[in-house]
C-alpha cells in the first residue's frame, strides 16, 4: 500500500506569526503550536500576546511573545535575531498582520494611507527578506505564508480601496518572491480569505451591517476552516507548491 505524502508534524520547526494578538493570527499561532512548532507570537498588543502564550503553554505547546510594530523597519530587522536567540532559527513565517481602511479614497488622511501601506504591504516585503536572508546563507529551506484577501481581485466600491490595493500587492509579492527564492527551497504561498468571524470583521459589520445576508451560504467563515490550508502550506506535503495563493471564501466572492 502506498503511504500518502502528508504530515502535519512540525516538531523541530520554529514559526513567526505577525498580528497574532487577535483574529486569524491568534488561531494560526495556536494551530502551529498544536502541531509541534515553537511559535513566536508577534503584535503591538503585548498583553494579548501574553494571554495567547499562556493558552498555548497550557495546551502543551511552546510559544513566546514578542512586541512588534510591523510599521517600524528597525523592529522588523531585529525580530529574526531575537526569535533565533530564544526559539531557534525560524523556518516558517506567517505574514498575517493587516489593517483595513474602511474609507473612500478621497476621505483618507495621509497618516491613514501610510499606516495601511506600511502595515499591509511594506512590512510583508521587508520581513520576508529578513526571514529569508539567514536561511539562504545556511542553505536551509523555509516556508512563507502571506495572508492576502479576496479583496485583492474584487472591489465593490463601498470603501477600502487602499486595502484592496495592498492585498493585490501581497499576492504579487507572493508570486515574485516565490520565483526568486525557488532555487533556495524557500516556498512562498498565500491564503486569500473571504469575510471570517474576527475582530476586524466585527468592526466592519458594526459600521456597515451584516454582510453575510448577501452570501450564498448566509454565514461568515470561521477561523478554524483555514487550519488545513495553513498546515498544508507549511508541511512537506506542499514541497512543490510555491507562488500560489489559495482562496478560502466559502463561495462569498465572484469568480
Predicted regions and their residues:
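Substrate-binding pocket helix/loop in short-chain dehydrogenase/reductase
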Residues: 104-105, 109-117, 211
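Short C-terminal tail/terminal secondary-structure segment
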Residues: 2-7, 231, 242-255
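Residue(s) in the substrate-gating loop at a strand-loop-helix junction
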Residues: 149
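Conserved glycine-rich cofactor-binding loop
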Residues: 14, 21-22
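Short, small/polar-rich loop/turn modules that mediate ligand/substrate recognition or access, typified
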Residues: 89, 182-187, 241-243
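Alpha-helical segment proximal to the catalytic Tyr-Lys
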Residues: 133, 179-183, 239
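Active-site helix of classical SDR
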Residues: 128, 166, 174
